Amino acid sequence: MWFQLKIEHCPNDKIEEITEELEEYGALSITLTDKNDNPVLEPEPGTTPLWPEVIIHALFAQAEEAQYVREQLVAKRPSLHCSLELLADKNWERAWMDDFRPQRFGNRLWVCPTWLPPPEPDAVNLMLDPGLAFGTGTHATTSLCLTWLEQADLKNKSIIDYGCGSGILSLAAIKLGAKHVYAVDIDNQALQATQSNAHANHITESQLSISTPEALQNPVHLIIANILLAPLISLKERFHQLLPSGAHLVTSGILEEQAPLLIDAYDSAFTHIATEYCEGWSLLVFTSK
């Protein structure tokens, strides 16, 4: 049996401090999850990539141990809401695994958890383990990007996946025919997740490069960026340098009402050619001028 301590109402600027304390108290595992099922999108430089409302889960072997940690945390931070849950063996793994089911995007692309067989073995199947980082296709922004990629002609194209997260867009692009993808992120955990998922899908170094954004040098046919509005605007000139005239830029990670702001900000360097919406989020397609 296992005992899970669930910590809510935790200010983002205290999360690192609390997770360090949990490690000192001997937590067997510590997991951060999103209260509202939002994705972790590329933050502005110098900020920590966290959801607006984070829940911390800490696993302990003894009830007394978990209760003691709960009391210590609440005594120091009365605003925290801490609850205990008894978990049967392996339920702590199954809890999130059961929620991740195979999903289809477009006509031929499936995103499947690594522990389940693909529903259509002959389809384009991307095997994904989201436990290491973020991005499973369940959020509207990721779904918009995957659907666009599935419908696009990616054969022999070079692509930058800016803010790669779990690597889901990079790997999908390769599975759909891209010649080479540059997966970049400012978060080392995201780069590690992308590498792990690439290995699970038998993706080679000749198909995928994984790095921080500073390593980008070569122009590409397409950039796809599922990141927030502020970094998207700040990256306009950088994207323009990496895209020859007529090349495509696909952006998501922005709300419907933010779309006009990005279109206006990009007008000097890019031509807006298409927009898709899903659950209040938007995907914008541009060509480089």
Swiss-Prot record:
Residues that bind S-adenosyl-L-methionine: T142, G163, D185, N226
Keyword S-adenosyl-L-methionine: yes
Catalytic reaction(s) noted: L-lysyl-[protein] + 3 S-adenosyl-L-methionine = N(6),N(6),N(6)-trimethyl-L-lysyl-[protein] + 3 S-adenosyl-L-homocysteine + 3 H(+)
SUPFAM superfamilies the UniProt entry points to: S-adenosyl-L-methionine-dependent methyltransferases
EC number of this enzyme: 2.1.1.-
Alphabetical keyword list: Cytoplasm, Methyltransferase, S-adenosyl-L-methionine, Transferase
A GO CC annotation given for this chain: cytosol
InterPro entries the record matches: Ribosomal_L11_MeTrfase_PrmA, Ribosomal_PrmA_MeTrfase, SAM-dependent_MTases_sf
BP terms from Gene Ontology: methylation
A Pfam family per the record: PrmA
UniProt GO MF annotations: protein-lysine N-methyltransferase activity
Localization, UniProt: Cytoplasm
Family: Belongs to the methyltransferase superfamily. PrmA family.
Name this protein carries in UniProt: Ribosomal protein L11 methyltransferase
Lineage: Bacteria, Pseudomonadati, Pseudomonadota, Gammaproteobacteria, Legionellales
Name of the gene this protein is made from: prmA
